């Protein structure tokens, strides 16, 4: 019974100690750069730790399908120049940048930080998905099934991340779906149409106002000229009342002369009969 105790202890020692292992998902488009973060805290200034990057899950030791490896100071192996470490190497930033990714770069990647001591490595697993760019299908040319571009996030190198969103352009019937960009375009066209209408209405009102002012000014000037002409005509014509009065006075004097002559002739009728009239025989 006791002979099995050393053997059981040996089996326990051979089992791998638990290491920190996380899996994160990242997405990039074909032809873009993919950024897979991995870092550690440097134990002391100038004391760096070897790391390895491999494609596939982290094995018990080292990395499977190694794409990049470092020692304490330099990169000792690189599968291709597409695999680069662009972080601060001396501050423990071992993030991997894969340039110009293809669909074959999809999969799980293992970042293994090889701290001194048995079974003391720190492992980090990251899942990379590579997608193709969305294809824009013109309206009216799609028949049958359409190409759908779901929103995707592209993480680029650096301290932050850059997000690019692609939207669905057509449904299954080939009908164009209104996107945010289309709504902005339609809104811009509506605004421009409203501005044109407003400018046209304003110009029409201004023209009507100018014509009204000109017509009113012309009418006032013509009315004033007519008034001045009437005053001049009245000033040049003789007064009709005075003319009529003079004519009436002359006729009255003639009648008086006629009456006086008739009276004179009637008083001397005993001597002879004579009738004098101032009127000429017809």
Swiss-Prot record:
Cysteine pairings via disulfide bonds: 38-111, 52-63, 58-110
One GO cellular component term: immunological synapse
Membrane topology label: Single-pass type I membrane protein
Gene3D superfamilies named in the record: Immunoglobulins
Biological process according to GO: adaptive immune response; cellular response to lipopolysaccharide; defense response to Gram-positive bacterium; inflammatory response; innate immune response; macrophage activation involved in immune response; maternal process involved in female pregnancy; natural killer cell tolerance induction
Superkingdom field: Eukaryota
Chain positions recorded as Ca(2+) binding sites: 115, 117, 120
GO molecular function: metal ion binding; transmembrane signaling receptor activity
Keywords assigned: Adaptive immunity, Cell junction, Disulfide bond, Glycoprotein, Immunity, Immunoglobulin domain, Inflammatory response, Innate immunity, Membrane, Metal-binding, Phosphoprotein, Signal, Transmembrane, Transmembrane helix
Annotated segments matching region Disordered: 138-163
Biased composition (Polar residues): 144-163
CDD domains linked to this entry: IgV_TIM-3_like (cd20982)
Residues in Ig-like V-type domain copies: 22-131
Parts of the chain that traverse the membrane: 195-215
Residues in the Cytoplasmic compartment per record: 216-282
Extracellular-side positions: 22-194
SUPFAM superfamilies: Immunoglobulin (SSF48726)
Main location: membrane
Region (Interaction with BAG6): 253-271
Positions of a 1,2-diacyl-sn-glycero-3-phospho-L-serine binding: 62, 112, 119
Glycosylation sites recorded in the entry for this protein: 74, 100, 147, 173
Signal peptide start-end: 1-21
Subcellular location: Membrane; Cell junction
The family this protein is said to belong to: Belongs to the immunoglobulin superfamily. TIM family.
Note: Expression is up-regulated in the spinal cord during experimental autoimmune encephalomyelitis (EAE) and following antigen restimulation of the encephalitogenic TCRBV8S2+ population. Expression was also detected by in situ hybridization in resident cells of the nervous system.
UniProt protein name: Hepatitis A virus cellular receptor 2 homolog
């Amino acid at each position: 019974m006791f002979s099995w105790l050393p053997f059981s202890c040996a089996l326990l020692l051979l089992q791998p100690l638990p290491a920190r292992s996380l899996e994160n998902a990242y997405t990039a488009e074909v032809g873009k750069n993919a950024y897979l973060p991995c870092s550690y805290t440097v134990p002391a200034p100038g004391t760096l730790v070897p790391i390895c990057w491999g494609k596939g899950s982290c094995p018990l030791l080292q990395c499977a399908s190694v794409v990049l490896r470092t020692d304490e100071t330099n990169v000792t192996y690189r599968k291709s120049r597409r695999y680069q470490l662009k972080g601060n190497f001396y501050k423990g930033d071992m993030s991997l940048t894969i340039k110009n990714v293809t669909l074959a770069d999809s999969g799980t990647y293992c970042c293994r930080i090889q701290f001194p001591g048995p079974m003391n490595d720190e492992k980090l697993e990251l899942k990379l998905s590579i997608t193709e760019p969305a294809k824009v299908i013109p309206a009216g040319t799609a028949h049958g099934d359409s190409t759908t571009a779901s929103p995707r996030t592209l993480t680029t190198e650096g301290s932050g991340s850059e997000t690019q969103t692609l939207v669905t352009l057509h449904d299954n019937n080939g009908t164009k779906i209104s996107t945010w960009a289309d709504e902005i375009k339609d809104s811009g066209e509506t605004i421009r149409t409203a501005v044109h209408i407003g400018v046209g209405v304003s110009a029409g009102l201004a023209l009507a106002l100018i014509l009204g002012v000109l017509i009113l000014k012309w009418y006032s000037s013509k009315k004033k000229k007519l008034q001045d002409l009437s005053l001049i005509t009245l000033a040049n014509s003789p007064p009709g009342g005075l003319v009529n009065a003079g004519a009436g006075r002359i006729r009255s004097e003639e009648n008086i002369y006629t009456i006086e002559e008739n009276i004179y002739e009637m008083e001397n009728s005993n001597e002879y009969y004579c009738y004098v009239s101032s009127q000429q025989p017809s």
